[in-house]
Amino acid sequence: MTNSIRIGTRKSPLALIHTNLVIQQIKQFFPDINCEIVPIITSGDLIQNKPLYDIGGKALFLKEIEQALLDKKIDLAVHSLKDVPGRIPEPLVIAAVLEREDPRDVFVCLKYKSIEELPQNAVIGSSAVRRKAFIQKIRPDLKVTVFRGNVDSRIKKLMTGEVDATILAYTGLKRLEVFNPEYCHLIEYSQMLPCIGQGVIAVEIRKDDNAMLEICNQINHLPTFELIKPERAFLEYLDANCRTPIAAYSQYLDANPRHLSKLAYREVFEGNTEALATAAYKSNRTDASTGLTYKLPLEVEFGKMSNIQTNFMLGNLDGSKITFHTETTNIKTSTEAGIKAAKMMLEAICK
């Protein structure tokens, strides 16, 4: 086991918060490991005056960080999963995620509490084509203008009257401690599906780095890791970019995902904690989606008792046509469900 880890991340306040959350998890299992944060300025951070879809998409927030990982200048990278494209360059892999936070979007406005309440022809600041598609579906009269920058800068633009409202991710507002219920209003999933992977912090490593894999095995939140598979499969199959209105949100139907592993263990071993400790490392399990082998075979057995429901959204490039689809599947076939939804919805959009 290594004594020190170099952790690559963006320099934004939110990215550094995410990185420190990962470090907290690492320290729980490996208290003696020294964690060095390596801040990296990405192309996406530097170019703020153009929409992401005009300059290469969200991958610009990863490019320099992934290159540092490939060059072995860092040992692992921390990302917001919503920024990670469906296809990751070899030999890199998302090997761990932290428990998902509330992935809903937030309507941020000083005078009104919802998109419906905005006056005719009001201006909403948002660069995300997903949000633009939902906004125009709800209120076709509203003007959606390009709105780049970090959370603080966007809120400042709102306060100075540059726009009438904006839409931001709840998790970012919460983690930065700037969620204010006086002008921040949660948007329900039925009105606006979140970005794929929203609310999830992801850890990326090189596949052949066994030391980092061991760490990821320990900190990985398996219920979340399984939950995002249909969302990510949907994204990967479509090879979607920032020009494509796309969304998906998965949830467990059978139990609280925080407790699924414990429930499964209790079912199998009837509370025999000594047997649990022995059996947890009894054999290996290879994850088909990553090719990685995890030494946590029984914990993932919660899949036998858990169904996942995923709501998908796909729009055409100009957002004039949007289709929705829902898949309910056993956890073991959730990746296939994402691919199935992508095929069906792509056909519907192209008609």
Curated annotation (Swiss-Prot):
Keywords: Porphyrin biosynthesis, Transferase. One of its GO terms (molecular function) is hydroxymethylbilane synthase activity. Coiled coil: none annotated. It catalyses: 4 porphobilinogen + H2O = hydroxymethylbilane + 4 NH4(+). The keyword Cell membrane does not apply. GO terms for cellular component: cytoplasm. The keyword Glycoprotein does not apply. Its cofactor is dipyrromethane. Pathway: Porphyrin-containing compound metabolism; protoporphyrin-IX biosynthesis; coproporphyrinogen-III from 5-aminolevulinate: step 2/4. Binds 1 dipyrromethane group covalently. CDD domains: PBP2_PBGD_2. Disulfide bonds: none annotated. Its EC number is 2.5.1.61. It holds the Pfam family Porphobil_deam. GO terms for biological process: protoporphyrinogen IX biosynthetic process. It is an enzyme of class 2 (transferase). The modification S-(dipyrrolylmethanemethyl)cysteine is found at residue 242. The porphobilinogen subunits are added to the dipyrromethane group. Tetrapolymerization of the monopyrrole PBG into the hydroxymethylbilane pre-uroporphyrinogen in several discrete steps. Monomer. Belongs to the HMBS family. This is Porphobilinogen deaminase. It comes from Rickettsia rickettsii (strain Sheila Smith). The lineage of its organism: Bacteria, Pseudomonadati, Pseudomonadota, Alphaproteobacteria, Rickettsiales.
